[in-house]
Amino acid sequence: MAKKILLCDPTLRDGNHAVRHQLTRESFAAYCQAAEAANVPVVEVGHGNGLGASSMLVGECLLSDEDIFTISREHLHKSRMAIHLIPGFCTIKKDLTRALELGVDLFRVASHCTEADITDRHIHFVRNSGKEAWGILMMSHMTSPAVLLEEARKMESYGAEAIVIMDSAGAYFPDDVKERISTLVNGLTVPVGFHGHNNLGMSVINSVVAVQEGATIIDGTIRGFGAGAGNTQLEVLVAVFERLGYETGIDLYKILDAADIAEKGFNPVAPSISPLSIVSGLAGVFSGFAKPVAKAAKDYNVDPRDIFFGLGERKAVAGQESLIYEVARDLAKRNENSVEKGQ
């Protein structure tokens, strides 16, 4: 019997990073219809940084969370509607309660890879409300497999029904994935998943290795639409898993049709492994920093690659966008001092 893989599609959430959180009503409606037709089991929607995150700090969303959920819910019937949420951005009283009222099916409660403690109240609230909650560990390359397991066990103890690790910076090689996924699969009683980014061109093979090591949940976005160099490309995953004998339940032809719809409707620059994306992966810095890093480099007349490596040294994580300009200012000052000394 073929092994079943649950493919989750965060195109309408992670993909929002690629257009500065400006996906339109028409884009949400059209893509939800296409994903539903292709039998995509889970469709994640929202601001790129999740529920309640729209702000000047990380980017203001064109649509409100409420509008996004209402539009998406209207077109998702077989497919489950999921959201990403980070405690701190997302409050229980204001945001989570309303998301429940608007029909969200699956809540992916996320934290930095060493800060699972902050998810306790949110996971408990979702579970006590009768809905499904998963634990998401972001920037998972920044700690060891042993610590990841400790943090994942915390989420499991809070009631998380699955644990997904995110390679948020696209920094992993297959051996990194193998070590971490096998550790989690052997140490947890809930399903384990993997969310890849393609900064170093490894996202598809990393996803395959994750499945070979026991992961049963894999994330992918249509056309790789997402932060930085993009996510693991969903339609490629469907084709590759079909070739390898895994069962996803997704209609290959219809997901390829969805890719065409997205390409024409979203009007993004097609995800590619740009020089900055490579540096982001090497530095281990969140892929979504690419655009603000480029702007800061221009504003301060410094090399954006140096900004990325500076952010890596400071172990910057998503939500710390203010560090980008701090690093840029420090580099500009250092360059100015070097010029003065050389005179």
From Swiss-Prot:
Pathway connected to this protein: Aromatic compound metabolism; 3-phenylpropanoate degradation
GO molecular function: 2-isopropylmalate synthase activity; 4-hydroxy-2-oxovalerate aldolase activity; manganese ion binding
Lyase recorded as keyword: yes
Record: residues binding substrate: 13-14, 168, 195
Residue positions of the active site: 17 (proton acceptor)
EC number per UniProt: 4.1.3.39
Manganese recorded as keyword: yes
Origin: domain of life: Bacteria
Major enzyme class: lyase
PANTHER family noted in UniProt: 2-ISOPROPYLMALATE SYNTHASE 1, CHLOROPLASTIC-RELATED, HOMOCITRATE SYNTHASE-RELATED
The protein, known as: 4-hydroxy-2-oxovalerate aldolase
Protein species of origin: Pectobacterium atrosepticum (strain SCRI 1043 / ATCC BAA-672)
Originating gene: mhpE
